[in-house]
């Protein structure tokens, strides 16, 4: 994942961000691209290799993703939302102090704003990600937020993008895909 707002690039003059004492950074793009070209050439007669990444975009990081997209000849980009307001879902920081209604509303609004303003992607990834980190049982996020989810999907479809059906809900023992 590339997660601007949370992580910095390997060559960022400010250095890495630390989480629990461990440095975390985005992909080392020059090294990744060099390795991609090497493997693509080495196995050219056996496999077609495409260049891609998953962009964990937030509205305020769109310009950074635009620059990254222009810097490399990507074939495939998954657009995802992994944080809102630079707060991680998986740590619970984003949900802290908010009701389910509040954090789902803000999550879907961020997703809507991103798909409305960022177009350099191939597929919208796991738009149900919040369910994985929602420790409250029984909240019907789909029906409670159906209008904005519909608006998001209309934009994605109008733009000719794909929509990922992420089946990790089975692994995480969630009730449904949405």
Model regions: which residues?
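A metal-dependent hydrolase metal-coordination microenvironment
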Residues: 1-105
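Domain-core and long-helix interface of multi-subunit machines
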Residues: 71-74, 78-178
């Amino acid at each position: 994942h590339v997660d601007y707002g949370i992580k910095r690039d390997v060559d960022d003059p400010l250095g890495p961000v630390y989480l629990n004492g461990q440095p975390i950074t985005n992909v080392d793009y020059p090294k990744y691209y060099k390795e991609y070209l090497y493997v693509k050439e080495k196995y050219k007669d056996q496999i077609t290799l495409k260049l891609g990444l998953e962009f964990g975009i937030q509205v305020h990081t769109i310009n950074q993703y635009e620059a990254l997209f222009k810097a490399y000849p990507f074939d495939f980009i998954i657009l995802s939302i992994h944080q809102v307001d630079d707060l991680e879902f998986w740590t619970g920081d984003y949900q802290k102090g908010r009701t389910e209604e509040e954090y789902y509303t803000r999550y879907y609004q961020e997703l809507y704003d991103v798909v409305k303003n960022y177009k350099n992607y191939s597929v919208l990834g796991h738009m149900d990600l919040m369910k994985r980190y929602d420790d409250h049982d029984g909240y019907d996020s789909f029906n409670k937020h159906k209008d904005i989810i519909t608006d998001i999907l209309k934009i994605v479809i109008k733009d000719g993008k794909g929509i990922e059906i992420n089946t990790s809900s089975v692994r995480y023992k969630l009730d449904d895909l949405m």
